[in-house]
Design a protein with these regions (language model features):
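A conserved segment at the C-terminal end of the G1
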Residues: 60-73
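P-loop (Walker A) phosphate-binding loop of NTP-binding proteins
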Residues: 54
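PAPS-dependent sulfation machinery
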Residues: 78-175, 245-250
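PAPS-dependent sulfotransferases, especially Golgi type II membrane carbohydrate sulfotransferases
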Residues: 1-43, 213, 220-364
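Conserved phosphate-donor/acceptor-positioning beta-strand/loop module used by diverse small-molecule
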Residues: 178-180, 189-214
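Hydrophobic anchor at the beta1->P-loop junction of P-loop NTPases
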Residues: 51
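Short catalytic-loop micro-motif centered on adjacent basic/acidic residues
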Residues: 174-178, 291-294
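Pre-Walker A (Motif I) flank of P-loop NTPase domains
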Residues: 45-48
Length: 364
C-alpha cells in the first residue's frame, strides 16, 4: 500500500479525526449494541484464534488463510478508520463504498491487498483500554490484563466483527486476528480470554533478522517522507519498524544486552529474536492453547490438519487455503558483525522450537 497514492486529503482528514476520538468511539461502540442488537444476538461467543509473533514470520499469510474460510471473521481495511465502532462505520460508509483493485502492500513483499483484505487492527482496542502501556521507548511485557471492562469489550468487539463480515454474504462463526503485540501478553492474555487459541509462527533466525532489518530501513525512509504514514501505523498500534519502532522488552533484554547495536544492524534483530522466542518457549507448556508453526514448513504448503485440530476447526477449511503460503526468497546475509555466541544461541533455540512445531506432529 502506497500511502501517498492511496490516501487523499479527505481520507487523511477523516483518519486524523478517528485517531483523536478514541473515547468517543468507545461510546459509539456502546450505541452499536443497541442499534444492532438483533444482528449481534445471532452471533455466538466461540473461542477466538489469535495469531502472533515477530513480524515477517508468516502471520499475514496465516491470517489470510483463516479469514478466507467460511468459518472465521477478521478485521479488514474497510473497518478503518473507526475501528472501535465498525458496524456503525460500515453502515455509514456503505453508500459510498469504494471498489478497488488488489495492489502490493507497503512492505513490497509480493503480498497483494485490497480494501477487503484482512488486516491487524485489534491493537486499537488494547490501546484504548491500556494507554499507559505505550508511553515508553519499549513495550513492556504484560504481567496481567486486568481491567474492569476490557474482557467484555473484547468479547463484544469480536462479535461485531463476525456480524459485520456476515453482511457480505458469508457465514463466519469465530473471530481471528493477527496482532504481533499479543506476543507481549503471553501468558497473561489467557486471564481475560481463557478459551483463546494462540498460534505463534517462527522463522530461521538469520533470515528472519535480515527481513526485519530490511523492513525497518524501508519504513524508516517512508516515515521520513510521509508523516501521515507514521501516524497511521502508530494509531493502529504497529510499532514494528521505522520511526515507530518500540520493541517488546522481554526480560529487560534491551538494557541487559551490553553494547547492543542499533536496529540498522543485523545483530540487533538477532538479539530481539532470541528474547522474543525464548519468552514463547518458556510458556510452550501451554500446549493446549499455544501452537508453534515453523515458517519454512508453511512455505512447503503442507497438510494443515494439525493446525486445524489445535484450533478446533474442520481441516478441509484450512487445507483449501494453502495457496496463501509460499517459500520466501532467501536474503544474502553478512554475519561478520554478529557475535558467534548469539548465532549459536539463536540456532539452538530455533531447533528447540522446531521440535515442538505443530506441523511436525501426527495431528492427534
Amino acid at each position: 500500500m502506497n500511502f501517498e497514492n492511496q490516501y487523499g486529503v479527505l481520507d487523511r482528514l477523516l483518519h486524523r479525526l478517528a485517531f483523536s476520538t478514541t473515547q468517543a468511539q468507545l461510546g459509539l461502540a456502546d450505541l452499536e449494541k443497541t442499534l444492532f442488537r438483533k444482528e449481534l444476538r445471532r452471533v455466538e461467543e466461540l473461542r477466538p484464534v489469535l495469531i502472533t509473533g515477530l513480524p515477517r514470520s508468516g502471520t499475514t499469510a496465516l491470517l489470510e488463510a483463516f479469514a478466507g474460510t467460511q468459518v472465521f471473521a477478521a478485521h479488514t481495511y474497510r473497518d478503518m478508520p473507526f475501528v472501535l465502532c465498525p458496524m456503525l462505520w460500515g453502515t455509514m460508509a456503505k453508500p459510498v463504498r469504494r471498489r478497488d483493485k488488489p495492489r502490493e502492500r507497503a512492505h513490497a513483499d509480493g503480498i497483494q491487498i485490497s480494501l477487503d483484505s484482512p488486516e491487524a487492527f485489534e491493537e486499537v482496542l488494547w490501546k484504548a483500554f491500556f494507554p499507559q502501556r505505550y508511553r515508553g521507548s519499549t513495550i513492556p511485557v504484560w504481567e496481567d490484563v486486568a481491567h474492569r471492562d476490557f474482557e467484555k469489550a473484547f468479547r463484544d468487539h469480536t462479535r461485531r466483527i463476525v456480524a459485520l463480515r456476515r453482511r457480505a454474504g458469508r457465514h463466519p462463526r469465530r473471530y481471528v486476528s493477527k496482532n504481533n503485540l499479543n506476543l507481549a501478553r503471553i501468558p497473561a492474555l489467557w486471564d481475560a480470554l481463557p478459551d483463546a487459541r494462540v498460534l505463534v509462527p517462527f522463522r530461521d533466525p538469520v533470515q528472519h533478522a535480515a527481513s526485519l532489518r530490511h523492513q525497518h530501513a524501508r519504513f524508516k525512509e517512508m516515515h521520513a517522507k510521509d508523516p501521515f504514514a507514521r501516524r497511521y501505523m502508530e494509531a493502529i498500534g504497529h510499532y514494528d519498524f521505522g520511526a515507530n519502532l518500540r520493541p517488546i522488552d522481554f526480560d529487560g533484554w534491551v538494557d541487559a544486552t551490553p553494547d547492543l547495536p542499533g536496529p540498522e544492524h543485523l545483530a540487533y534483530w538477532i538479539r530481539y529474536w532470541i528474547a522474543a522466542y525464548r519468552h514463547v518457549l518458556r510458556h510452550e507448556p501451554e500446549r493446549k492453547r499455544l501452537g508453534l508453526i515453523r515458517f519454512e514448513t508453511l512455505g512447503e504448503r503442507p497438510d494443515l490438519t494439525p493446525i486445524a485440530h489445535h484450533v478446533k476447526c474442520e481441516p478441509n477449511d484450512l487445507n483449501n487455503r494453502r495457496r496463501h503460503f509460499r517459500a520466501a526468497r532467501p536474503h544474502e546475509v553478512d554475519l561478520s558483525h554478529v557475535p558467534s555466541a548469539w548465532l549459536d544461541e539463536a540456532r539452538e533455540l530455533y531447533e528447540q522450537l522446531s521440535a515442538r512445531c505443530l506441523l511436525t506432529r501426527d495431528g492427534t
